[in-house]
Amino acid sequence: MKNPLWGGRFTTSSSDIMKKINESISFDKTLYEEDIAGSIAHCKMLVNQRIISKYEGQLIIHGLEVIQNQISSGTFEFSTDLEDIHMNIEHNLKKMVGNIAGKLHTARSRNDQVATDFKLWIRKSIVKIEHYLHELQDTIINLAESHYNTIMPGFTHLQIAQPVTLGHHLMAYFEMFKRDFSRWQDLYKRMNQCPLGSAALAGTSFPIDRHFVAQELGFYSPTENSIDAVSDRDYAIEFLSNASICIMHLSRLAEEIILWCSYNFKFITLSDNITTGSSIMPQKKNPDAAELIRGKTGRIFASLNQILVVMKGLPLAYSKDMQEDKEALFDATNNLMLCIEAMNNMLSNIIINKNNMLKAAEHDYSTATDLADWLVKNLNLSFREAHETTGQIVKLAEHNQCKLHELTLEQIKTIIPSINDTVFSVLSVENSVASRTSYGGTAPTNVIEAIKKGKAYLSNIKFSQTDKNNI
């Protein structure tokens, strides 16, 4: 049987292998709500413009609503012979209303149809991701507030560097996710133009009203160029770029969770409901959720790379290669939302082992920078001189197998005779942390202010939206 929608100039039907490689219904049926919403808006416009009759429009819209209910309830039968979601819906619409169904495709192509569907789906997904991120940020800021003065080691090169507060460390991730949130908002604004009415690539000679359709579907405006509208997927690439940055931030936090719950750190304890055991080692409690977030990061990165490679060599306008844009994006979206939710679950039930964090912060001469700063402020040394002198004092402590504050004044004077006993005030991790009051620093007073600002931000946040986000 020849294809009922495009088989007019063909004398034979597609081979089985052609049908197999050509079909996309196995994955683009995900777009059924968006496809039907776009078709209803297009149908209303055709009626308004008197391209089809009001009666025909009513029949078509009723049929589309019936099909939507069938798909939602699981009673609709998809066919790979009909290639994609568009043709499956139109074929079944024809069964209901007859040849009138064919009038729905007046002044449109599957090229602008799928671009519209895809934008609607991405737009809806952006709003979902924003809500997931908002919940995660709320969990992070509440945890930071509970530990605004909990001292832990700060690291560079995964070596203990300087003492910081856990609250400050957590607020670093809050800021990362805040920027992620703004990227989703920016994308929503940039992509929210409607391709429908661009037809195959050149527009149409029918007297359509693209502004009506755009408004009906909640877009800010129609796209400005019909070729651009059907031939680019930069919004999908940007979506996956945002997803990649966001999952990268999640992966870094997941990596720290994995480290922190290990025997070597013992900074945290994860809840039983977000960990797993071993089939052979009864004592194991594995941070599998964190590891899977870290692992799924590569999967999302690959999705971005996939669509970049698909698009990089395509001449204008549409090519069938672009059918390969959806599976990767659907997969990345589902996994990103799952990972955000899993991270939120982990942090909501985490136990912080404060004493272990404090003890670790006191190791590896973490207040050496404070000592160097004291030498600059009190003995008028240049920072380079103070750095050299402090290094010698650290070496002395290593030789004596003690911490900096355990050295005697007499021992330190063998390095720098002009030093006095007030230096010991800066060698405790508590004083070190309290002194870091520069804007954005780790002092508990700063963390409290950062949390206040963060809470105000969360309470005033505006999610990307139109009055059609349910489409």
Swiss-Prot record:
Lyase listed as a keyword:
yes
The record lists the catalysed reaction(s) as:
2-(N(omega)-L-arginino)succinate = fumarate + L-arginine
* Keyword terms of this UniProt record: Amino-acid biosynthesis, Arginine biosynthesis, Cytoplasm, Lyase
Q: What class of enzyme is it?
A: lyase
Pathway assignment reads: Amino-acid biosynthesis; L-arginine biosynthesis; L-arginine from L-ornithine and carbamoyl phosphate: step 3/3
Compartments (UniProt record): Cytoplasm
Its main localization is: cytoplasm
Enzyme Commission no: 4.3.2.1
Can you tell me which family this protein belongs to? Belongs to the lyase 1 family. Argininosuccinate lyase subfamily.
Mind telling me what this protein is named? Argininosuccinate lyase
Lineage, opening ranks: Bacteria, Pseudomonadati, Pseudomonadota, Alphaproteobacteria, Rickettsiales
